[in-house]
Regions:
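Alpha-helical repeat scaffolds
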Residues: 41-50, 75-87, 111-127, 146-152
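A membrane-cytosol interface segment of integral membrane proteins
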Residues: 98-118
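Generic helix N-cap/helix-start motif at coil->alpha-helix transitions
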Residues: 19-29, 54-63, 91-100, 126-137
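Feature marks short, highly hydrophobic, charge-poor N-terminal signal-anchor/signal peptide-like helices
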Residues: 1-9
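Acidic, Ser/Thr-rich low-complexity segments on the non-lumenal side of membrane proteins
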Residues: 43-74
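Transmembrane-cytosolic junction motif
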Residues: 15-42
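Residue-level signature for tetratricopeptide repeat
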Residues: 29, 33, 64-71, 101-108, ...
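Soluble C-terminal extramembrane regulatory/interaction domains of multi-pass membrane proteins
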Residues: 130-152
Length: 152
């Protein structure tokens, strides 16, 4: 009798683990399908659904939302997403990824002030080579400095 209970518990555990992974992958596939088809309403609705909130942490959902707004080219929502994500708790790898993504976005938008703020934040978390590269890009494109011509 004890073996039957143990076997049943093991089977139930395996089914739950496999089932949740399948469900999570199913949600991700639906998100990708909506994004590829340009169905942003369905994409954002699925991001806000209870299963998505259960399986994906807030940072991941907001990062996916940001990518949706970038594909949609909704500048106001992109800025709101960057503000929200940059204020969230995240590990250094996530923070560096978001800071660099925001830096290049605001570089395209010619926003000196925001790029400068992001460069300062980047200096606290990134390798010197990354910050130096971004500093050079900032100086050339936004400050219009020509002092790097000899180095190139």
């Amino acid at each position: 009798m004890d073996y039957k209970i143990i076997i049943l518990a093991v089977v139930i555990t395996i089914v739950l683990i496999v089932g949740t992974q399948v469900w999570k992958q199913s949600i991700l596939k639906k998100l990708l399908k909506h994004m590829q088809q340009g169905d942003f309403n369905a994409y954002f609705k699925l991001l806000d659904s209870l299963p998505c909130k259960y399986f994906y942490p807030p940072f991941n959902r907001e990062y996916m939302r940001l990518n949706g707004y970038i594909m949609k080219a909704d500048k106001k929502k992109i800025e709101e997403c960057f503000e929200l994500i940059l204020s969230m708790r995240m590990n250094k790898k996530q923070e560096l990824d978001v800071v660099i993504k925001a830096f290049y976005y605001y570089l395209d938008e010619d926003s000196k002030k925001k790029c400068k703020t992001l460069l300062e934040r980047m200096k606290k978390i990134a390798d010197e080579s990354i910050t130096q590269e971004c500093q050079v890009i900032y100086d050339i494109l936004l400050e219009e400095k020509t002092s790097y011509i000899d180095d190139m």
